Amino acid sequence: MKKKLVSVLLVAAMGASVLAGCGSRSVKEDGGEKKSESSGNNVLEFYHGYYQDESEWAAAQVMRDIYDEFAQEHADGDVTFKPIAVENRDDIVSAQVAGGSFPDMVDVGGGGVPQAAISQDLVYDLKPYIDENNLQDAVGLNYTQHDQDGHIYAVHDQIESRGLWYNSSIFEKAGISTDAFTDWNTFGDAMTKIADLGDDTYGYIAGQGSSYIVNAIMASTDAGKKMVESELTEDTVNSDEFANAFKTAAKLDQANGSEHTTDDNGNLMAEFNTNGNVGVLFNGVWNASGIDASLVDSIEPALFPGNVAIASAGGGLAVANNMSEEKTELALEFIKYMTSKEVQEKIFTEVQANPCNTTVDLNALAETSGDTATQKLAEACAQVNSADKIVVD
């Protein structure tokens, strides 16, 4: 189920917009919407979304450095690897597909590879390469989630893993234990206790986060989980599973207070990570890197009530079909590089994300780092990976 569509329905009930705005910066490179072969046979253009300044998002610089290292390693080859940072990668893909072509290589967004590109045979099938090189463990969840009738058209180097984070100091002050995450009733009771403290603290950041409540509640049943992992349909909206999840989320949000609702969690993120005024934040494992040093000992990871996690291979690296043999070979080598243990360890320790490679020992890396936030990242990843219910969002 598309979380933005769920959010739209929540808007109607709660009177708050929950659709995050999206950027409008276009590609800085000329010819960004030309066919992949127009750049010349000796250049492999790679569009990615890590355009942010290091001061804005340090992880973006880490990813660019990883890309640049690959380019330097292959600088003497017949094909030049050219990473291009853009904010409008999905627009570039859509424009090229509409014209019957596909970028040489692109890290597609959460929407994945457009079906129109697949139906036109514009995208390279990565599965034979993965199988021939025994990369099943290296690509991890991609191998099953991105399987389309025996074909794999994208591999994401990170797993988008979501649970929640809670402030143990606030919980202790309100007399709450981790039993609060047993189910959504105990969760609601816990949020009421936080509200009853009578100070500036409140339960959780609602709005965008409320869509995750709906999805997590639905994922607690097999029928609901199947609906979440499919397109939103009229039958889904009219189902008992959706009605129960929607009503529960609406009730929780109303009790939590409309002033604590936002269309983008980022607008109130500092309330949790820096100011310590919020009991719970629905966010991915990557939130570990945003916790202020003064709160790092108090903030802990947990799963959604009912031992539910949301995890997705997301979009990922996709390669154009019918390129030259040399360009295709370099593109495949890049995918092997990005899913290698060495790079995946950097993605965990420096990007602070859940790596796709299942052979990476996250706990060992965290202990070696000696960094509390990294250790909590490892704990969050481990919880998601071992959840009773893992739903694809």
Regions found by a protein language model. Name each.
Residues 151-157, 162, 185-234, 278:
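Extracytoplasmic/periplasmic solute-binding protein
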Residues 85, 109-161, 185-189, 300-302, ...:
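Hinge/lid segment of periplasmic solute-binding proteins
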Residues 349-393:
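Long, aromatic- and glycine/proline-rich binding clefts that accommodate carbohydrate-like moieties
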Residues 114-117, 285-297:
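A ligand-binding cleft/hinge motif common to bilobed small-molecule-binding domains
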Residues 6-9, 20-115, 326, 330:
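Conserved N-terminal structural module of periplasmic/extracytoplasmic solute-binding proteins
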